[in-house]
């Protein structure tokens, strides 16, 4: 998994050198940010179910046809609604992984890489997940540095879906 720190180490190693003072300063900066990131990950994890359910409702309000159309990829029955909440929960989980890892690696490796294919295969609209992520960003209850950290990964996911 790529993070700014692992990339700096890999570059220095491939060049047969130690980390430069600038690279070390970046690493120390990352460690200072780590506390805010871990606070954000902890908060998102503890609120994951309520955030996912709120995001599901936001999607249904903006796209009411998702609860009216029949089919396995829509939320016309409880099974479909459960799948929607599960999928939104995956996004929350991956964002928390990014917060812990300190980089977009988890989003890049586990979600974005195959996202277009998954959405196409299962006839899922990225706009549903954009709406869900916007809800999560607006309602996670974080402030200060933890909010900045969480929002950066949420925005990254939104941009990847857009």
From Swiss-Prot:
InterPro entries on file: Globin-like_sf (IPR009050), Phycobilisome_asu/bsu (IPR012128), Phycobilisome_asu/bsu_sf (IPR038719), Phycocyanin_a (IPR006246)
Keywords of the record: Antenna complex, Bile pigment, Chromophore, Electron transport, Membrane, Photosynthesis, Phycobilisome, Thylakoid, Transport
GO BP annotation list: photosynthesis
Source organism, top-level taxon: Bacteria
Post-translational note: Contains one covalently linked bilin chromophore.
One GO CC annotation: plasma membrane-derived thylakoid membrane
Main location: membrane
Location(s) in or outside the cell: Cellular thylakoid membrane
UniProt xrefs under Pfam families: Phycobilisome
Residues involved in (2R,3E)-phycocyanobilin binding: 84
Membrane topology: Peripheral membrane protein
CDD domains listed in its UniProt record: PC-PEC_alpha
Induction note: Phycocyanin-2 is expressed in red but not in green light (inducible phycocyanin).
Secretion signal, residue range per the UniProt entry: none
Family: Belongs to the phycobiliprotein family.
Function: Light-harvesting photosynthetic bile pigment-protein from the phycobiliprotein complex (phycobilisome, PBS). Phycocyanin is the major phycobiliprotein in the PBS rod.
Binding partners and assembly: Heterodimer of an alpha and a beta subunit, which further assembles into trimers and the trimers into hexamers.
Protein name, as recorded: C-phycocyanin-2 alpha subunit
